[in-house]
Amino acid sequence: MNPIVINKLQRKLGYTFTHQELLQQALTHRSASSKHNERLEFLGDSILSYVIANALYQRFPRVDEGDMSRMRATLVRGNTLAEMAREFDLGECLRLGPGELKSGGYRRESILADTVEALIGGVFLDSDIQAVEQLILSWYASRLDQISPGDKQKDPKTRLQEFLQGRHLPLPSYLVVQVRGEAHDQEFTIHCQVSGMAEPVVGTGSSRRKAEQAAAEQALIKLGIE
């Protein structure tokens, strides 16, 4: 891997790996090597959930469990992590197999999001829970400052449904138009048709549910609600 690119990434992350092999593994998609990042992703997913849950618990002492769960879901969902990955220019650092490279895997939201979680797992193994917690909180500083309890934290499908019901309009329809990849690493493409929109909006994700949520979010943006 290009050391200039890797050093640039570590500066953006705010962390330099002692064990560079952990960084390399975190950046390796299963299409590129048998020593890929999925176990690190599993670990990072759990650590991220704990760190964000704890941060919300400390910041919002009077907010109930339901609102905290919705805020956490907003902060750790795939499109938030993919957005963060793009801020780190993570796409240019990924190790992908030829097929994924050809199909633009370095832009795929699910791959970017999974890699952020794998990096969190790698940082934890390279250091300790205190270090990874401080790093995650630094990544999330502005997002934690901006988030607040309330209806905005409901998932996009729920918000879209409530918006349409409030105006006595038909519910949206979701149609799977494409499924790419192997069973262990699929990408779903969904068309969401909303009453009053000439064209369906498109969402992609690593599961049908995630793709539907992404499509609903695009619909909310087009409707001027987001």
From Swiss-Prot:
Reaction equations catalysed: Endonucleolytic cleavage to 5'-phosphomonoester
Residue intervals of the DRBM domain: 155-225
Molecular function GO labels: double-stranded RNA binding; metal ion binding; ribonuclease III activity; rRNA binding
Compartment annotation: Cytoplasm
GO cellular component terms, semicolon-separated: cytoplasm
GO biological process: mRNA processing; regulation of gene expression; rRNA processing; tRNA processing
Highest taxon in the source lineage: Bacteria
EC number(s) per entry: 3.1.26.3
Matching InterPro entries: dsRBD_dom, RNase_III, RNase_III_dom, RNase_III_sf
Enzyme class: hydrolase
Active site: 45, 117
SMART domains listed in its UniProt record: DSRM, RIBOc
Binding site for Mg(2+): 41, 114, 117
Keyword entries, A-Z: Cytoplasm, Endonuclease, Hydrolase, Magnesium, Metal-binding, mRNA processing, Nuclease, RNA-binding, rRNA processing, rRNA-binding, tRNA processing
Classification via CDD domains: DSRM_RNAse_III_family, RIBOc
UniProt domain RNase III: residue ranges: 6-128
Requisite cofactors: Mg(2+)
Main location class: cytoplasm
Assembly with partners or alone: Homodimer.
Function: Digests double-stranded RNA. Involved in the processing of primary rRNA transcript to yield the immediate precursors to the large and small rRNAs (23S and 16S). Processes some mRNAs, and tRNAs when they are encoded in the rRNA operon. Processes pre-crRNA and tracrRNA of type II CRISPR loci if present in the organism.
Similarity field: Belongs to the ribonuclease III family.
Protein known as: Ribonuclease 3
Species the sequence originates in: Erwinia tasmaniensis (strain DSM 17950 / CFBP 7177 / CIP 109463 / NCPPB 4357 / Et1/99)
Gene: rnc
